[in-house]
Amino acid sequence: MIPVLPVSAQAGRLNEFIAQVNDYDCERIFTPIPDAEMVISITGDSMTPEYVNGCRVLVKRIDDRAFIDWGKTYVLDTASGVVIKNIFPTSDPATVRCVSVNPAYPAFEVQAKDIYAWYKVLMSMTMK
């Protein structure tokens, strides 16, 4: 079973939150994905229709120095908060490009030094 963090993407610093939350504060769920480490709820519509408001994503923290699967979806813990985006390289190795699935939202770049942690999205769950 893995913890469902009582925080959503686009809200505060994830690393600080994880350090402060107690295991007993978290709902726990069974996961069909053996490598999943935690569950995060998604808010907003920037990633619809792939990740809808209120869905939950199962994620695994990765070492961004080892390998980044460009073009895939990640939850990034950044200096500006937690975001879920499709991530692409830029011509500047010190920045990454964050792209929403919803074309109504413009892409933006984030300095690599402002990314505290990378979490690869392994699966999404939506309640019907």
Residue ranges and their predicted role:
Residues 68-70:
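Short Pro/Gly-enriched beta-strand edge/turn motifs at strand-loop
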Residues 1-53, 63-66, 125-128:
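Short, positionally conserved secondary-structure boundary motifs
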Residues 86-128:
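Glycine- and charge-enriched low-complexity intrinsically disordered segments
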Residues 3, 41, 58, 83-86, ...:
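Residues located in well-ordered beta-strands
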Residues 59-60, 76:
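A generic structural signal for residues embedded in beta-strands
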Residues 45-48, 62-65, 79-82, 92-93, ...:
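Short, charged/polar surface micro-motifs in flexible loops or helix N-caps
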